[in-house]
């Protein structure tokens, strides 16, 4: 499902433990880490999509988590041109997401990344609150920052941890004899 502007409705999940660390997962067969996320199906509410994705990708049931809050509106990111499938219809140029902050109230042993027929992730770990902004693929950084800034006060009512500066993604050097434009 893609909206009239070319954005796919989606939910993003920030799962935190009692220490204020967040769940960080590696996509299968890649060195790409991200928060769990997934599309909202037709006739599905964002909260229904949240719990479906949480079970499919992380293996947790609603009883394993406490919903602490969600973003006030959609947060959008555009895909780089090389990732846009321009031959598919409708063309999806990015995602619009409602982000949810969850606290794990069950046992972390309940996490099972292989609960679905097609798992998304092969490894996970707890990381410091701002770590995902440093490590996520560049085109998602702004959305991750906004989601963490908006939802973080629910997890840290006395003040957010200090956010380290985010560096620009490294560019590889051009081949010998080539000049950058």
From Swiss-Prot:
Basic residues biased stretches: 168-181
Residues covered by region (Disordered): 159-181
Domain of life, per lineage: Bacteria
Cofactor(s) the protein needs: a divalent metal cation
Alphabetical UniProt keywords: Hydrolase
Function: Accelerates the degradation of transcripts by removing pyrophosphate from the 5'-end of triphosphorylated RNA, leading to a more labile monophosphorylated state that can stimulate subsequent ribonuclease cleavage.
Name of this protein: RNA pyrophosphohydrolase
Species per Swiss-Prot/TrEMBL record: Alkalilimnicola ehrlichii (strain ATCC BAA-1101 / DSM 17681 / MLHE-1)
Taxonomic classification: Bacteria, Pseudomonadati, Pseudomonadota, Gammaproteobacteria, Chromatiales
